Amino acid sequence: MPPRFIELSHPIEAGMVTYPGLPVPEVKIIVDYDTSNERYKGKSEFLIASLHACGNTGTYVDSPIHRHRGGTDLAGLPLERLAHVPISVFDATSFGRAIGPELFKGADVRGKAVIVRTDFSKHWRTEAYGKDNPFLTADACDVLAGAGAWLVGIDSLNIDDIGDLVRPAHTILLGAGIPICEHMTNLSQLPASGGHLHAVPIPWKGGATFPVRAYVLL
């Protein structure tokens, strides 16, 4: 049986809003088909474009330096935390906004990508997506960090309550060296376990956050 892939990333396009107040992506055509066709004397043609985007665009990974000065940057993230990581998916759709440690009670998440399903991604690219987001509590993040999770992902605007300026989830998880993947989608298509997550950003030295093509291989 051929492998099955589940797409977990939102497509990126010019002008889309990921997080209210941050710059939207801009696309510039550098070489178009007509220009290149002339350059190659009608024998071939190409499209070359540039994408100017904030690191917090679409579905992206946070590295520790995003929250902590002197923390590990994107280039320093170990690939074993980002590629072919066994998944452990938790259904938090009945929790309301605050997702506490009881969701993870008794679960073995050591060395796993903890993926929290809220179904908030159904509001993607609507005004509703920019407020009242589901989030992980500080106690929940303490549990995950202590249990040895390798990555934590969520299909929400933010893993923190955007009204909490302390940002405990980012503080705890990134402080423990655990990458965060936000703005995921299609989590309802995932089994509770048995798949492997791939969510690898570019090795940007000094980079804090960057979009990823996140997917699970079943």
Predicted segments with their positions:
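Active-/binding-site microenvironments in catalytic and ligand-binding cores
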Residues: 1-218
